[in-house]
Amino acid sequence: MTLPFKAVAVDMDGTFLDDRKQFDHEQFDQLLTEFEKRGVHFIVASGRPYVRLKQDFKGFADRMDFVTLNGSRLIIKGKDAASYPMNRADVLELLDDVQAKYGKMATMVFQKDIAYLHSEIDKDERDFLAYFAGNSDVIDDWDDLPEDDIYQITFGMDSKHAADVEEAFNKNHENKISAFASATFAIDVNVKGVSKGSGLERLLAKMGMTGNDLIAFGDGGNDIPMLDFAKYSYAMANGMDKVKKHAKFIAPANTENGVFRVLQKYLDEDK
């Protein structure tokens, strides 16, 4: 029997990582080696930026591919493959709009290799978010953001408002946005048309593959487009109920090494 897929895509938080934000490096090395022997690509599809993911996968990153910032920046074996930035003026307006409607909250604005957090937010909250950035700085005024491309905004707010944030902004703007519930209290905003699903579609196309060649694992709202795209889609047992409705299969929880267990089962059957 040969494996039914040629590429693996995994979300990070709540999926590939356990609740301590860790994974078994030795086990992963063995898994990755087996996939390399079979010509299978291992892809991380995350709302995290590449600068953070390189730290997460130190010693492995050059053997992998990445769909970062929910599909805004694509990396193949350490090299930029494509990127899809937001409109700067729209970003600044959205930051004002959301704060005016929902009040002050922890917010991150992601550029290529750095994320910015506003100084008026409590330091403990900033430090928590900074972990996900990998490289961050504090800014006093969003208007002072460097002129570099902006790829994502993450709002630390109840994710039930994601659809409202998207709808309210898109109603009055030509340059549209997409808003995803990335966690219970986090909303990621990207340029319209960008998602983990579109990112994987574009990445796989560069390799001569489609969603029919993909197995994917996720737990959060921003994983739904990826699960819809993949022929072999797994929601984690610990995932959101709405996410499970978009998956063909359920994997054991992230705390039970769910991704590894499912993938190892496929490898064990490929003898």
Residue ranges and their predicted role:
Residues G39-I43, D62-M64, Q152, N212-L214, ...:
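Short active-site oxyanion
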Residues T2-A7, H25, D188-K271:
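Mg2+-dependent phosphoryl-transfer enzymes with acidic/Ser/Thr/Gly-rich catalytic loops
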Residues P4-K21:
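Asp-based phosphoryl-transfer active-site loop
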Residues F23-E125:
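Active-site phosphate-binding/coordination module
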Residues K104-F217, G221-F229, N238:
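Conserved acidic, metal-coordinating active-site core of Asp-based
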Residues R63-L69, Y84, L129, S233-A237, ...:
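Short hydrophobic/aromatic-enriched beta-strand-loop microsegments
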Residues F60-D62, N70, H173-N175, F229-A230, ...:
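Short, structured coil segments at secondary-structure junctions
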Residues E34, D97-Q99, A168-K171, K242:
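Alpha-helical scaffold elements within enzyme catalytic domains, especially in hydrolases
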